[in-house]
Amino acid sequence: MGSVSKANVPKIDVSPLFGDDQAAKMRVAQQIDAASRDTGFFYAVNHGINVQRLSQKTKEFHMSITPEEKWDLAIRAYNKEHQDQVRAGYYLSIPGKKAVESFCYLNPNFTPDHPRIQAKTPTHEVNVWPDETKHPGFQDFAEQYYWDVFGLSSALLKGYALALGKEENFFARHFKPDDTLASVVLIRYPYLDPYPEAAIKTAADGTKLSFEWHEDVSLITVLYQSNVQNLQVETAAGYQDIEADDTGYLINCGSYMAHLTNNYYKAPIHRVKWVNAERQSLPFFVNLGYDSVIDPFDPREPNGKSDREPLSYGDYLQNGLVSLINKNGQT
């Protein structure tokens, strides 16, 4: 295989999106628009989040949680006793077969008395947490991080709205603390010696992968990752490497944005290369509320009309998550 070229992934200073300078916001929006119509990825810098602390706290959690604790937190795909845990909980590694492991948590406002929890509405779950005495401060940190990255995501959605010629709250009004289905996933890719062959996939072009090509199931995805190059995006010139940057957030659109904009902002197809290195991948999947519906539009059309049908976010999310598991396997 020849060398793989580097994808165009600009660094965009998103700090104006938190302020009131409309001209500065529009300049950011123009950069978001250009990136979204190119490779579909950009790095958000000057985002205001302490990512070094995020990385350190996540590392402490990953390195201290025991196999017994993981089992006690495992989602139902791994632990059949946990029938209410479809999304939230621990996703186990499988010795000799699957190396990656992760911990997923949802909206901290989904408490047992939340109306959606009471109604057993799909995709809504109460989070499960490890023992506070064994992981002091972890739950508090994780919940605070959810709201920190929620705030960043709200600002980014204003940038996307302006980029698409909409008023800045066009998306954000559907992204609310009381009902967002957004999730944080704390993914650990371990260094293993030997590394199990069964955990390595091979693409049609011969590239060894940890996770095969896919589009994200989200409106947008806000990703922090270690400074280890691993992601590739499909472009007209073939797959290209996305450079790692552990100071910024890697941003891309999910397939709900592609649906809404009639693929004006596509959901970039990307994949995870196999790299035998201890590293983190910590995505925040920006999801709207279960009943949220935004009418599709086409920015390229003079009247803005799209032939696509409106799709409730709850239906989109349920079907999208199942389809991704069916295609690429249980994460």
From Swiss-Prot:
2-oxoglutarate binds at residue 279. N-[(5S)-5-amino-5-carboxypentanoyl]-L-cysteinyl-D-valine binds at residues 87, 91, 183, 189, 214, 216, 281. It catalyses: N-[(5S)-5-amino-5-carboxypentanoyl]-L-cysteinyl-D-valine + O2 = isopenicillin N + 2 H2O. One of its GO terms (cellular component) is cytosol. InterPro entries: DIOX_N, IPNS-like_FE2OG_OXY, IPNS-like_sf, Isopenicillin-N_synth_CS, Oxoglu/Fe-dep_dioxygenase_dom. GO terms for biological process: penicillin biosynthetic process. This is Isopenicillin N synthase. The lineage of its organism: Eukaryota, Fungi, Dikarya, Ascomycota, Pezizomycotina. The gene is ipnA.
